[in-house]
């Protein structure tokens, strides 16, 4: 989860988020190298006398600055397309959870279980217990088994919402009349927080998401107690 004054990304909890962080570092290094080259050329132009002002063309230079950007774009595009494919691929999910956005709360339905559904509201600040996080705690957490592929079906009952959990690399729009899907896989147990990431009205900031990832046997006990 996030920490006060944190500058970097949240700790990766899913394979997708690990890939996204690696891609971020890869792209940032390319941007840093290009920026350094541009600053170096600008400094040369400002500190040296201009030469070859009468040159009309330079075939070698034009070839380089045509081919080099194309190579750089390919170096960025290939890993990006690979991650997009991974995010869209869902192989034999063990569980499907339907998520519906409302103004201003989330409702969840475990479609593999009969009558296992609930609404999830933010806990008001005055009702928080010591150690709980302001604007991030909910009355009903989404309990899911860890280390297993889970399919989330996401939609909305009213306006546009967005179901996002940064540490899992998840951000999927909840659109009325349309069913989007996402894959959830956690490498470790714990509580993972997110929020609605699409402005949806006056209480947009009060739609937190809390995923509780637990071992499979604990999830089975929880689901049995909820039915």
Swiss-Prot record:
CDD domains: CcO_II_C. It is a multi-pass membrane protein. One of its GO terms (molecular function) is cytochrome-c oxidase activity. GO terms for cellular component: mitochondrial inner membrane; mitochondrion; respiratory chain complex IV. Residues 1-22, 82-227 are mitochondrial intermembrane. The modification Phosphotyrosine is found at residue 218. Cu cation A2 binds at residues 196, 198, 200, 204. It is found in: Mitochondrion inner membrane. InterPro entries: CcO_II (IPR045187), CcO_II-like_C (IPR002429), CcO_II_C (IPR034210), Copper_CuA (IPR001505), Cupredoxin (IPR008972), Cyt_c_oxidase_su2 (IPR014222), Cyt_c_oxidase_su2_TM_dom (IPR011759), Cyt_c_oxidase_su2_TM_sf (IPR036257). It is an enzyme of class 7 (translocase). Binds a dinuclear copper A center per subunit. Component of the cytochrome c oxidase (complex IV, CIV), a multisubunit enzyme composed of 14 subunits. The complex is composed of a catalytic core of 3 subunits MT-CO1, MT-CO2 and MT-CO3, encoded in the mitochondrial DNA, and 11 supernumerary subunits COX4I, COX5A, COX5B, COX6A, COX6B, COX6C, COX7A, COX7B, COX7C, COX8 and NDUFA4, which are encoded in the nuclear genome. Belongs to the cytochrome c oxidase subunit 2 family. This is Cytochrome c oxidase subunit 2. The lineage of its organism: Eukaryota, Metazoa, Chordata, Craniata, Vertebrata.
